[in-house]
């Protein structure tokens, strides 16, 4: 007689404790009060947006009007890809009429998107990069979404969202969704870093790894060396050091989430420094580097601008950029040492 119980236990979807994202968030918050349930519900909506984007990406090459550019530019002066626009609209759609967030701010919008009917009760703001690394979409390489949740402070009657211009320690939660061989969601609410994999058979993000911890040192450095001659001497000296010393290897995909995920899991350093012409760098603080810095430090790593802790940096406007160094403590401190040495030489110390 067939053992149906054994068939069930051998099911691929049931080969581990199926801890879902919403259950895990509530466990981490150790509460079932209204605030905890709000954060859990927001995370569920973010997960829904990730599922919708992942579905679109999986069929992008088979559908018309998905790949390529829209012909428009965003507030950053960058050409907008169709997937950028689609993913941005997805995040807005899943939070409309949710009662959970009052504002959404993203790379694709000059000003925050307000949901007035949510504002009396949804005292949260979602900041996000809907598709990071969108240049990879057309060639079927990894891309991701980055998100940060902040508590709204004050009434924001002027609609200028000035309360968002605070340091990264003010984040309530942050994370990213990586669209790769599997779709993975990584998040932290200040109690460690945890990863979830989307199980297509269940339609749920299932806990894959809890309390991810980075090694203090890693062999990987991730940087766009095509910018070598645009960097300050300190960064060029650091790269030359990497080239001269054995035990280091370069990995760079052009997708921040993919490169950062490798560093998070294996150790090493990701850097996107400023250039001589643009010392502020390329990456935006509030919805790109601050959320990732939050994750890195929660996992035991270090996040820096090169001259100060990245999470201490206070922006003066919504889309402010900052030089970025993220990774294992020893690797980040090595980069910082080159910058500090250059500063000492400049002042003659």
Curated annotation (Swiss-Prot):
It is found in: Cytoplasm. Mg(2+) 2 binds at residues 129, 132, 288. GO terms for molecular function: fructose 1,6-bisphosphate 1-phosphatase activity; magnesium ion binding. Substrate binds at residues 132-135, 224, 252, 282. It catalyses: beta-D-fructose 1,6-bisphosphate + H2O = beta-D-fructose 6-phosphate + phosphate. Binds 2 magnesium ions per subunit. One of its GO terms (biological process) is fructose 6-phosphate metabolic process. The keyword Metal-binding applies. Pathway: Carbohydrate biosynthesis; Calvin cycle. Mg(2+) 1 binds at residues 107, 129, 131. One of its GO terms (cellular component) is cytosol. Keywords: Calvin cycle, Carbohydrate metabolism, Cytoplasm, Hydrolase, Magnesium, Metal-binding. PROSITE patterns: FBPASE. Its cofactor is Mg(2+). It is an enzyme of class 3 (hydrolase). Its EC number is 3.1.3.11. NCBIfam families: PRK09293.1-1. Belongs to the FBPase class 1 family. Homotetramer. This is Fructose-1,6-bisphosphatase class 1. The gene is fbp.
């Amino acid at each position: 007689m067939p053992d149906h119980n054994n068939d069930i236990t051998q099911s691929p979807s049931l080969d581990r404790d199926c801890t879902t994202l919403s259950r895990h968030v509530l466990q981490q918050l150790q509460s079932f009060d209204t605030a905890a349930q709000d954060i859990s519900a927001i995370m569920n909506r973010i997960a829904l947006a990730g599922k919708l984007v992942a579905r679109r990406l999986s069929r992008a090459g088979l559908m018309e009007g998905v790949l390529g550019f829209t012909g428009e530019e965003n507030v950053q002066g960058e050409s907008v890809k169709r997937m950028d626009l689609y993913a941005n609209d997805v995040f807005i759609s899943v939070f409309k009429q949710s009662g959970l967030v009052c504002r959404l701010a993203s790379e694709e919008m000059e000003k925050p998107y307000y949901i007035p009917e949510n504002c009396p009760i949804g005292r949260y703001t979602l900041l996000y990069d809907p598709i990071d690394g969108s240049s990879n979409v057309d060639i079927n390489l990894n891309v991701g979404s980055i998100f940060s949740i902040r508590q709204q402070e004050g009434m924001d009657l002027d609609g200028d969202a000035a309360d968002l211009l605070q340091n990264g320690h003010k984040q309530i939660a942050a994370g990213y969704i990586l669209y790769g061989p599997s779709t993975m969601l990584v998040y932290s609410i200040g109690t460690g870093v945890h990863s979830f994999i989307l199980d297509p058979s269940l339609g749920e993000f299932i806990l894959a790894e809890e309390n991810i911890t980075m090694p203090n040192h890693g062999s990987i450095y991730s940087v766009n060396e095509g910018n070598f001659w645009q960097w300050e001497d300190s960064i060029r000296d650091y790269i030359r050091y990497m080239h001269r010393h054995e035990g280091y290897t370069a990995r760079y995909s052009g997708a921040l989430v993919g490169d950062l995920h490798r560093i998070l899991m294996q150790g090493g350093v990701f850097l996107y420094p400023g250039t001589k012409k643009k010392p502020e760098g390329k990456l935006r603080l509030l919805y790109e580097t601050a959320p990732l810095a939050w994750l890195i430090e929660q996992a035991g790593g270090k996040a820096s601008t090169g001259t100060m802790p990245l999470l201490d940096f206070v922006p003066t406007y919504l889309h402010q950029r900052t030089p970025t160094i993220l990774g294992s403590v020893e690797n980040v401190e090595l980069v910082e040492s080159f910058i500090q040495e250059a500063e000492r030489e400049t002042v003659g110390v």
